[in-house]
């Protein structure tokens, strides 16, 4: 009797266990969120790479915070490389010089110049000479042409506005052809290198971005016992930010307007923003437009830098 009772209890427990509802299924794990797309900026490599990396790191930190998207700086090796990167869409926005900006826009339909510094609507190039060359300061392009004839000379980058295009234009306006120089004109690759080459006497004279010259003077990085300014050009439009047309699709129709607002509120008097403005050598950014660079395009075509 006891054995039968035990068997019955076992049977009941088995039936109850078999009939119990299965445990609820676990909800599938949520898929990880896709990483936010980075907004990629670049710039012509017109100065020492270390200076550029420091400056653009400060800028991307500021932009990432203000825009709410990751902003990344992509350095390039030369002027042609950044024009190509903009053309193929490897970068979204680039800090171009006047000439490279025109070259880039002509290759990307719908690209827009949106911002420049306050100093870029009245920019200049500075001609410098080694004191050992005997070239003295002068007052106009005609005197410049006469003084440079028979001397060695270096530009900056081949595609630089302030380091090649406009200096060559004003040299020609004064009556000097490149064949009037001693040997072929050099191309240093950057404004900083132009200073060092002329300072060392490798070339008798050279031309560069006036803002870079002033900045290096201020920091005591120029030996004025060896090099001096001989002439400064009339003004022209130069550096500017250009944005690709597909940014509106990738980041929103109002993203360009957000960029303009973010840049134009930068203030050199703000301690947190001073590093950025000091790097750019300006007090503020202002809006610009493609039409402001029509003269640069015309001169580029005359000199053969734009086909």
Task: List the predicted regions and their residue ranges.
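C-terminal motif of bacterial Sec signal peptides marking the signal peptidase cleavage site
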Residues: 16-18
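An extracytoplasmic/periplasmic, membrane-proximal ligand-sensing/linker region
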Residues: 20-21, 33-43, 47-58, 236, ...
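Ligand-binding cleft/hinge of the Venus flytrap
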Residues: 57-68, 157, 161-187, 217-223, ...
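Short helix-initiation/N-cap motifs at beta->coil->alpha
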Residues: 73-84, 97-99, 178-196
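Hydrophobic residues within well-ordered alpha-helices
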Residues: 86-87, 148, 198-199
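A ligand-binding cleft/hinge motif common to bilobed small-molecule-binding domains
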Residues: 95-108, 172-173, 199, 204-225
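Short beta-strand->loop
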Residues: 111-120, 181-184, 217-235
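A conserved helix-loop-strand patch within extracytoplasmic ligand-binding domains
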Residues: 117-174
């Amino acid at each position: 009797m006891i054995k039968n009772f035990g068997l019955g209890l076992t049977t009941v427990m088995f039936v109850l266990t078999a009939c119990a509802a299965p445990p609820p299924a676990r909800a599938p794990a949520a898929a990880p969120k896709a990483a936010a797309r980075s907004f990629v900026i670049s710039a012509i490599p017109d100065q020492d790479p270390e200076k550029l990396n420091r400056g653009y790191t400060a800028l991307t930190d500021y932009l990432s915070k203000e825009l709410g998207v990751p902003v990344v700086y992509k350095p390039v090796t030369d002027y042609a490389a950044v024009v190509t990167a903009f053309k193929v869409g490897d970068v979204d926005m680039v800090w171009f010089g006047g000439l490279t900006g025109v070259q880039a826009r002509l290759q990307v339909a719908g690209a827009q110049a949106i911002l420049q510094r306050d100093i870029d609507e009245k920019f200049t190039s500075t001609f410098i000479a080694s004191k050992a060359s005997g070239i003295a300061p002068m007052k106009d392009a005609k005197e410049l042409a006469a003084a440079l004839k028979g001397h060695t000379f270096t530009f900056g980058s081949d595609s630089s506005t302030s380091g090649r295009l406009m200096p060559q234009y004003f040299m020609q306006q004064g009556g000097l052809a490149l064949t009037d120089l001693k040997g072929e004109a050099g191309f240093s690759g950057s404004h900083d290198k132009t200073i060092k080459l002329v300072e060392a006497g490798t070339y008798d004279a050279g031309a560069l971005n006036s803002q870079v010259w002033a900045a290096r003077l201020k920091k005591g990085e120029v030996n004025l016992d060896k090099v001096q300014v001989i002439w400064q050009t009339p003004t022209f439009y130069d550096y500017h930010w250009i944005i690709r047309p597909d940014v509106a699709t990738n980041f929103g129709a109002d993203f360009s307007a957000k960029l303009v607002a973010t840049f134009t509120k930068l203030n050199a008097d703000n301690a947190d923003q001073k590093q950025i403005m000091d790097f750019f050598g300006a007090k503020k950014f202002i809006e610009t437009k493609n039409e402001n660079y029509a003269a640069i395009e015309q001169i580029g075509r005359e000199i053969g830098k734009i086909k």
